[in-house]
Design a protein with these regions (language model features):
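Conserved N-proximal alpha/beta basic substrate-recognition cap immediately N-terminal to
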Residues: 15-127
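Extreme N-terminal starter segment of soluble prokaryotic enzymes
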Residues: 3-8
């Protein structure tokens, strides 16, 4: 049995995505085309417990439709170590929640490819 390819996206609320300017939907559509299953979560959905980094994720299907651009298939608790890639898409306010998410994700950074790694944004904040 082939292991499924999972792209986990950490982003802002789905309701706040502007499909005219935000490339998150485009990236998710391309990942789907390449056979990835998309799991989406917000920074506050992350947890680190008993050595595991998990997130309360939405299993999503994305569409090209700008008005209804996603469908929630299910909600699940997901061990992020099982993701092939974690894509960081949210813009920080540089607050405690953001800092917590950077520290949590650092625990799996050597085992999961993290694109736009949080610690690089924390350590080299350009604002």
């Amino acid at each position: 049995m082939m292991k499924k390819k999972i792209l986990a996206i950490q982003g802002s609320s789905l309701k706040k995505i502007n499909t005219n300017t935000d490339t998150t939907v485009f990236l998710a559509l391309e990942a789907q085309r390449r056979g990835y299953q998309i799991y989406y979560f917000e920074p506050q959905d992350l947890s680190f417990l008993s050595g595991k980094v998990t997130a309360k994720c939405f299993d999503l299907t994305f569409f090209k439709n700008k008005k209804k651009f996603y469908k929630i298939n299910k909600k699940l608790d997901f061990n992020l170590i099982k993701a092939k890639i974690i894509l960081i898409r949210n813009e920080p306010p540089f607050d405690q929640q953001y800092i917590n998410s950077t520290f949590i994700l650092e625990h799996i950074a050597k085992k999961v490819k993290i694109i736009k790694r949080s610690n690089s944004r924390k350590n080299w904040n350009h604002k």
